[in-house]
Structures are given as C-alpha cells and as structure tokens.
C-alpha cells in the first residue's frame, strides 16, 4: 500500500514539474530557435578567394595546378610523377609545358 502511495506521489510530482508554466517562461526557450532567413543572414558563406578580396596577402595561385590535376587523372602520368617529378612526367606525356 505504501508503494502505491509513493508511486502516485512520484507521478503527481513528475506531472507538475513537466507541465509548462503559464507565466511565459517558454518565451526564453523560443528565442533559441531562429528562422531560416535570420540564420542565413547571420551565417555568411565564405568567398572562394576571400584572401584576395580582403587585401590580406595570401599565397598566389599555382599556374601549374591545372596541369598537375590533368597528370593526376592519368594513372600512368601520376605513377611517373611519383618517380621523376610532376613537371617532367607531364612533359613526357603531354609535351612541353
């Protein structure tokens, strides 16, 4: 009998603590969620060449990067580049740079 009374008391206590308060305390928790538009305004996407636009000196782009990617896509050129270097492997497969 005591166990049933304790169980009933625990259920009532849990119910009273879980109910939302009528004094508007949920207004604080509603501020935690923002709309998609507000979120998009708050978080700006970083530009691709941000360092060049802001005046901060960054590393200049490598002019051979496109050729390096072409050589990496060819398994034979990529293997040869591991052995003798990228520029020489590219020259042997695709002609002078």
Curated annotation (Swiss-Prot):
Q: Per its UniProt record, what InterPro entries does this chain match? A: GLA-like_dom_SF (IPR035972), GLA_domain (IPR000294), Osteocalcin (IPR039176), Osteocalcin/MGP (IPR002384)
Q: Pro-segment residues?
A: 21-48
Gla domain segment(s) = 49-95
- Primary localization class, coarse: secreted
Kindly list the positions annotated as binding Ca(2+) 1.
Answer: 65
**Can you tell me which family this protein belongs to?**
Belongs to the osteocalcin/matrix Gla protein family.
Give the function comment from the record.
Answer: The carboxylated form is one of the main organic components of the bone matrix, which constitutes 1-2% of the total bone protein. The carboxylated form binds strongly to apatite and calcium.
Name of the protein in question: Osteocalcin
Gene field = BGLAP
